[in-house]
Curated annotation (Swiss-Prot):
GO cellular-component term (any): nucleus
SMART domains in the record: ZnF_C2H2 (SM00355)
UniProt protein name: Zinc finger protein draculin
Domain of life of the organism encoding this protein: Eukaryota
GO term, biological process aspect, one: regulation of transcription by RNA polymerase II
Organism: Danio rerio
Pfam families: zf-C2H2 (PF00096), zf-C2H2_6 (PF13912)
Bias type Basic and acidic residues, positions: 8-32
Gene Ontology molecular function, alphabetical: DNA binding; DNA-binding transcription factor activity, RNA polymerase II-specific; RNA polymerase II transcription regulatory region sequence-specific DNA binding; zinc ion binding
Amino acid sequence: MKNTTKPCRTEHHNAEGQRDRMEGNKKGETKAKKSVACSHCKKRFSHKAHLQIHMRVHTGEKPYRCDQCGKCFPYKQSLKLHLDIHAKGNPYTCDECGESFKTRLQLRSHMTLHPKYKPYKCDQCEKSYGREDHLQRHMKLHTGEKPHKCEHCGKSFPMRDLLRSHLMVHSEVKPYTCDQCGKGFTLKKSYNEHMNIHTGERPYTCDQCGKGFPYEQSLNLHMRFHREEKPFTCDQCGQSFSQKGAYNIHMKIHTGEKPYTCDQCGMSFRHGYSLKLHMTHHTGEKPFHCDQCDKCYSTALFLKNHIKTHDKAQIYSCLTCGKTFNQLRGLRLHEKRHSLTKPFMCFDCGKCYFTDTELKQHLPVHSNERPYMCSLCFKSFPRMGSLIVHEKTHNGEKPDCRTGSKKSQDE
């Protein structure tokens, strides 16, 4: 039967009802030309009414309210599904473990925890999926295939939904605004994760060491340390990195590139954070305050290192010697020192080390290379560890440091 529904030109609530009825009518849409496009994510629709309903995703509008619990929804159908929860309790039960859920979607999400519901396994990273097409989509991450290209900046993505999320970056509309700092966001997830910074909440927790993170991406990067993944390797010295950002920073050591210039004194830096740290030398700004004492610091890192002096809780203990550590990573590195073997040997002097990282840090001693420079006084060091020890001297009064290419004593 032909649909003869006509748009209402008079009352707003009738138009609302009609749009929701049209939302469920998919038959005509599959045949009709999708001529109306969303200005935010470029998704196309065959009717303007469908586009207006879709816009609620970006505006956050939720006109349908549950009169039992006050929860609001963008669509009438979503409210109907929600009302079933109040009426039925937990009607959906898992056949494997007997746990019950309020919605079918929650049950389906839970079922993926049982191994037999994830038969499609990735042979490269051991991840499992309940559907073959999900595995195929995941495999693009390993093959490097990125068929979905942004027409604005040329950036490519392995999956269409990642492209859609990226397109929001080019949109000037940012419907989600932080009421504490005024920063705007195109995606609600980005807004929610940003709010974790203000609240101090860290909902993404590592299941191996218990460390929490405000961002999901931060947890994903952290997990590479546990898996000992270092996919980014320098082709000049062989050093590997778990994060691309760290790799890019390292490469500037070989190229000598210093793109960040101070507009006060003309000094140039390899890294943006080094310039930012240097600028506090001109301004004298120390915005990071310790809430346990009256000390102030120019960077969050200096404050973080200082706070550790107040924290007496040592969590991880060495079973061999009893030494304690704040981080599990520190304990694991320490435990290697109880081994009788030092498999990494320097061919110039014969000195041996427990890890390849220690050997790589030692090698610049023979080449007179001093790639690690203090961004405050420009003293240079052959090893990162020496630089870190030196930078701690800037936490208090600035020492009388010499700059330039003069050699510094790091032993």
